[in-house]
């Protein structure tokens, strides 16, 4: 089976698009992704990436024009019968390594950590889900010694509203999204820097279409 998806992003300054094709190869998946840079000046390798994925185990991405490889490995172990999800990511070109972990205490509570190896970049996050509808996520940035906050609420019909606030940049964000596994998804975002003079919020919109071929 082959699946195709098309993603378009639109904002005041610029617009862009991404198309991908995914093929099932046994218990693995092969994926080719192209951006609009692949076609602007005629067909080219610009914006082309190739990937092989075994869901839940690994993803290997190859950026064709940059000749760069990104490795991602996933694993789950159990501590006191509770899952600890671990992800290891290495970008060869940037020589960066990221370790990410999340510990699911119960369906309503989760602890997460994200650390870039060799730096002070580390974020700690707590996720609380109330009644399966409302989610509250405080996040502590160790390097900046700052807190970020996110609150989201599920609505009828699959819609989701989310508000975020970054204390370091004083950036306030609002997001309305809807995700459908069969047809696709959309997301509309508005952001405003509260540290600057009063300006109209910056608006962006994303939409994704999924097809089975």
Swiss-Prot record:
Give me the Gene Ontology terms describing cellular component: chloroplast outer membrane; etioplast membrane; plastid; pore complex
Q: Which GO terms describe its molecular function?
A: porin activity; voltage-gated monoatomic cation channel activity
Q: Give the transmembrane ranges.
A: 3-12, 18-27, 32-41, 55-63, 70-79, 93-102, 108-117, 122-131, 144-155, 159-167, 170-178, 202-211
- Could you state one GO biological process linked to this protein? regulation of monoatomic ion transmembrane transport
The question of whether Chloroplast is a record keyword is answered with yes
InterPro entries (UniProt xref): OEP24 (IPR034626)
The membrane topology term of the UniProt record is:
Multi-pass membrane protein
**What are the record keywords, sorted?**
Chloroplast, Ion transport, Membrane, Plastid, Plastid outer membrane, Porin, Transmembrane, Transmembrane beta strand, Transport
Question: Can you say where in the cell this protein is located?
Answer: Plastid, Etioplast membrane; Plastid, Chloroplast outer membrane
Reading the lineage from the top rank, the first entry is Eukaryota
* Topology, Chloroplast intermembrane side: 13-17, 42-54, 80-92, 118-121, 156-158, 179-201
The stretches that face the Cytoplasmic side, renumbered to this chain, are 1-2, 28-31, 64-69, 103-107, 132-143, 168-169, 212-213
Query: How does the record describe its quaternary structure?
Result: Homooligomers form large rather nonselective pores in plastidial outer membranes.
Describe its function. Answer: High-conductance voltage-dependent solute channel with a slight selectivity for cations transporting triosephosphates, dicarboxylic acids, ATP, inorganic phosphate (Pi), sugars, and positively or negatively charged amino acids.
Family the UniProt entry places it in: Belongs to the plastid outer envelope porin OEP24 (TC 1.B.28) family.
- What's the protein here called? Outer envelope pore protein 24A, chloroplastic
Q: Which organism is it from?
A: Arabidopsis thaliana
């Amino acid at each position: 089976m082959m699946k195709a998806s098309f993603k378009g992003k639109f904002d005041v300054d610029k617009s862009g698009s991404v198309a991908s094709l995914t093929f099932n190869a046994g218990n693995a998946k092969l994926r080719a992704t192209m951006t609009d840079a692949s076609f602007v000046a005629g067909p080219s390798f610009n914006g082309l990436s190739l990937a092989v994925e075994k869901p839940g185990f690994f993803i290997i991405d190859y950026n064709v024009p940059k000749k760069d490889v990104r490795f991602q490995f996933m694993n789950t172990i159990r501590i006191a019968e509770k899952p600890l999800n671990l992800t290891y990511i290495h970008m060869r070109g940037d020589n960066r390594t990221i370790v990410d972990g999340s510990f699911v205490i119960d369906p309503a509570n989760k602890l997460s950590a994200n650390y870039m190896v060799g730096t002070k970049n580390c974020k700690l996050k707590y996720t609380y889900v109330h009644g399966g509808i409302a989610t509250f996520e405080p996040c502590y940035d160790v390097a900046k010694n700052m807190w970020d906050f996110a609150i989201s609420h599920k609505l009828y019909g699959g819609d989701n509203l989310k508000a975020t606030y970054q204390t370091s940049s004083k950036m306030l964000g609002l997001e309305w999204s809807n995700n459908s596994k069969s047809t696709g998804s959309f997301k509309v975002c508005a952001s405003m820097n509260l540290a600057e003079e009063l300006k109209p919020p910056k608006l962006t919109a994303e939409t994704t279409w999924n097809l089975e071929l």
